[in-house]
Amino acid sequence: MPLLVDRPMHSFATVGGATCLTSATNLNTPSGGGCILLVDCSANDGGVIDSLSIIANEATTTASNVIVFLSTATTTSTISTANTVAVAIGGIGSTNMGERTNIALPPLSVPVPNLGGDTTVSETDKKNTGLYVPSGALVYVGVDVVLTAPSATTVAHVFAQGGFF
């Protein structure tokens, strides 16, 4: 059965000024100071993100990862390891202005039509990908390394597309 959405979702966040982790080598250390709200489902029936993209705004942007967090924290000041988990990650390694990087998302329980009986494709290939955001949850994004090149004001944009239930 397909996921039915009430209205489309198109949201963006600007990242790069602060790191979203307290430890650069541990995804289980979210820092509210570097997390930026991307999607808010705290007061609706939830949603699904079917596409996440990173846009590098400047040539030779600092190499960094954009980390996507699913959280029940309604403000960045209340983000902690108890209420926030990393669910996706994508890299910024731009040498070209405007370069887009799509963040890989996990398979959903939504089948792709006409692939059910095909034994030549994997079980994962038979499902659409996306990120289900339950009612009461929020999606935050941030970078693991502050974007300092080519300038101290360098930022990247993260776009989410999908729908709200």
Features from the language model and the residues they span:
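Surface-exposed, low-hydrophobicity beta-strand/loop segments enriched in small/polar/acidic residues
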Residues: 1-165
